[in-house]
Amino acid sequence: MLEFKRAFNAQTKFHSTVHEEFWAILAQHLLSQLDLPLDRARVYIGPGQSLQGLYFHPESPEQAFGTQLGNTIKPKFKDRDFMIALKTDFNLTLNHHRAPLKTSGSIPELFLPLVTIECKQYIDKTMMDNALSAATKLKAFSPFTLDIVTIELNKLSDVNIAGSGLDGFYILRKQKLSEARFRNGDGPKDTVDVARRNPLDNEVILKVYEAMKNHIESNRWHCDEEAFFEQGFVTNGL
């Protein structure tokens, strides 16, 4: 088994982890407990590509100025390790012309995310910067999506999510990556010795669960004028 452990680093799928599947199980339980009129056929739980934006991309001046304007609107997708999303058909009509929006992988529905989780065994500065940038872009298109990162081990010397679109950052094992590496350098750089990892922390897992629950149950996604006058304030989903 040691030969296999040497062959893959901590970010591969070959190490012992059920990170994404774990959140899917909790999300299924969460939705079953909610007192909401859910159409379960429209709810998607798991990894996938969520809609992140639409952009104008004509292939020629004739297409841009002609009658086929709908063909110039392209969807942009983002890979998600885990999400709770709404499945929906998406039809766009421009100048009485239906835009044939093609989804990634020929999937017939679009996924509109309510919750997204970036799942990592560990995270370094470059990966963290990418996560912060992706969160900011997501919030520009979908401001009411809860976007969080969960990691098992930490490689960062400084953790700061201020100014980004990221809503939360959770470390499930409360342990540094350096503390879980092979002692004698038996594997590649940053290879994790699973026997040295801390167990998953129940309190942190509960925090993630509560964050998802509070977000989905929130009644402050929208505030009409009457409610605004009655309560005297509106917050950004907090």
Where are the regions a protein language model picked out?
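Short His-Asn-centered micro-motif
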Residues: 117-122, 149-153
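Phosphate/oxyanion-binding active-site loops and adjacent basic polyanion-contact surfaces
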Residues: 15-23, 75-79, 124-127
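Short, flexible loop/turn elements at secondary-structure junctions
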Residues: 86-88, 120-123
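C-terminal tail/extension regions appended to the core domain(s) of diverse proteins
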Residues: 1-17, 24, 28-45, 51-58, ...
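Conserved catalytic cores of phosphodiester-cleaving nucleases, focusing on short active-site segments
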Residues: 82, 113-121, 131
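Active-site-adjacent loop/helix micro-motif of nuclease/hydrolase catalytic cores
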Residues: 92-96, 122-133
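A contiguous pocket-lining binding segment that forms or flanks enzyme active sites
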Residues: 129-147
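Active-site metal-binding core of divalent-cation-utilizing nuclease and nuclease-like domains
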Residues: 46-107
